[in-house]
Amino acid sequence: MDSIDLFYDKGKLELCTFINEPTNKFMKLSSFVYGIISFHDGKIRVPGRLTDQLITDDDDVDFSSLEGREVVPRFRRRYSVDKSDLIPTISLAFTLADEYYPHQEYSVLAPNKEYDIPGVVGYGVYTSRFRIKESGLERAVPFIDEDSATASVEAGKLALIHSGVDSRLVGKVYVGSESNPYAVKPIASKVAQVLKLGEEDGDIQGVDAVDTEFACKAATSMFKDAASLVSYPRSGIKYAMVIGADNAQAAPRGCIGGELDTFVGYGGAAFIFGKHDVIAEVEGWYSCTSDTPDFWRRDGEPFPMHGGRFTGDPAYFKHVRKATQKLMEHFNLKASDLNYFVAHQPNPQFPVRIAKELGFRDEQYLPSIQINKFGNTYSGCSPVGLAAVLDIAKPEERILVTSYGSGAGSDAYLLRTTSQLVDKRKRQKINVKFQAENPFIEYVDYTTYRRLKLGM
């Protein structure tokens, strides 16, 4: 019997019921809606849970407002398990297609123009519809069945849709995260399986998948590796995917390390690198590293600690400054020669300060500042900023993006956009602005925020 993949399809919620007394495995979900979803004009019917719904036992659920509406498959945790157990996931949770996450068709395009140097051929950003808003700062909050693995899959899916790349041609996938639900078990293998990356043989994907770690630059460190790999003629790899995703962690306020709880967010970004139909060429890069103890999380500890004054000048500013200046010197560039500058955003102040110090004008760096909308998404932070710039950039513009990872190091990249950037833009409904200003965003209080961050 052939397997059926509905992950990119759109379904219809035919019948549903309200589960207000869930069994133990589903207890953390509280009350939820369960139903029958049909696909392909009713030829296929599957049971599924409606997710991204905060429902209390007292809520009066109007089934007539749900039944008959179109839904989109989502990749989520399935139910709660003990800490030592495997985490069950499923791609048959669903959200309403006319709300935060609309359906987008995944149509594969044959490779067309080949470029001399590699670059980004597509990208995607995923953040949750839930937010907490305090003192003018909004932060994305995962729903209770989300984590860094589910965000990685969703971001990778959006990148494939945007690029038009055949998933079977992706020969390498990197996932950078510091909030993997497992200490030993990669996110990348799950991404590869769900998105069917590489040639599929039975239940095995012909793709190299690896997780990476270097605090908030775990993903950007791999940009150069991905670009190099697709350029090596003997690798046989046409495309490589790099994902940065985190459910950024911080101790509760009032506890040691709780100061970080003001800025942590949730989400991820995925970039596909190749030499065909490039939207932004990678012109060059520079990386720097030092053993600086500005931020850490010991093995077995749930929340990170930070080194106070070491997080500023000796850490973030020193590395971002050096990587940026060295790259600009190598290409004999002044700040005025660039169209956009993207820096890592641990808080709203640091990226603005370093941008001004380096001579960039407001219009060069402000489009990348997304921490005020999503919070610090750790490994996804500077990639989300880069995506925000790519969403609005014009052809033949130069972008300098400099990431930062505690412990400590920075990667600076120089990108040049192409005409294909505009051509592919219409393929992506769910861009950064769409998610930042979405009318279906749901705001939660601090107690709910802490509960959702802990997950199932």
Predicted regions and their residues:
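OB-fold/S1-family single-stranded nucleic acid-binding modules
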Residues: 74-106
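Phosphate/pyrophosphate-binding loops at sites that engage ATP/ADP/AMP, CoA/4′-phosphopantetheine
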Residues: 155-171, 321-337, 358, 393
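Condensing-enzyme catalytic core mediating Claisen C-C bond formation in acyl metabolism
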Residues: 105-146, 256-314, 318, 407, ...
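Cys/His-rich short segments
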Residues: 1-8, 456
